[in-house]
């Protein structure tokens, strides 16, 4: 990934008038690109792997909706730039998507610190997530957040193995109340390989 695709600045973004005109097309392109950057885990959670383009789309959309000007732009860049992979990591938004509020509260209350027990397994080696340190995602009562921002920091040999399409790559958690594993498809792997350079 070229260095210019590791950090977004104002010159990467469309002005609101242009974005408004092109929004429908841009959103279709983003949906298509995200298709192979998504992995479901168990009955309630999904990983959405981020990159320069997903974060750029998120910032554009937030600016379009909230119209907060330069101050908002600074805040959005500060919030989303750290979620762009740096070339030796994968970055994911890990979401628990539970519609029923009672079920959601019950599940999240049983999953304290799940963010610290989440991993990608490459060639038998677990790479545990490093949560984004913006705020604690598990509160004092042990209830976790429904949204986590996770960095999976790879060593060179992990990247090499990940790029081998014959190598099985899994994602999962070691949490006692959510011991699920998913195998990444070759389509997902092919999309995520582009995050390494």
Regions found by a protein language model. Name each.
Residues 2-89, 97-197:
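Long, contiguous binding/interaction regions
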């Amino acid at each position: 990934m070229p260095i210019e695709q590791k950090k977004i600045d104002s010159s990467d973004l469309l002005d609101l008038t242009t974005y408004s005109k092109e929004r429908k097309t841009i959103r279709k392109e983003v949906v298509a690109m995200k298709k192979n950057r998504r992995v479901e885990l168990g009955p309630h959670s999904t990983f959405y792997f981020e990159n320069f383009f997903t974060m750029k789309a998120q910032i554009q959309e937030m600016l379009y909706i909230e119209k907060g000007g330069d101050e908002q732009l600074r805040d959005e860049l500060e919030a989303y730039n750290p979620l762009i992979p740096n070339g030796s990591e994968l970055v994911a938004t890990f979401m628990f998507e539970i519609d029923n509020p009672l079920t959601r509260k019950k599940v999240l209350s049983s999953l304290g610190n799940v963010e610290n027990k989440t991993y990608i397994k490459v060639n038998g080696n677990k790479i545990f997530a490093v949560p984004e340190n913006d705020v604690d995602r598990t509160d004092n009562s042990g209830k976790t957040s429904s949204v986590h921002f996770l960095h999976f920091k790879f060593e060179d040999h992990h990247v090499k193995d990940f790029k081998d399409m014959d190598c099985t790559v899994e994602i999962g958690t070691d949490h006692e109340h959510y011991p699920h594993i998913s195998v990444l498809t070759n389509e997902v792997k092919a999309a995520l390989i582009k995050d390494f350079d």
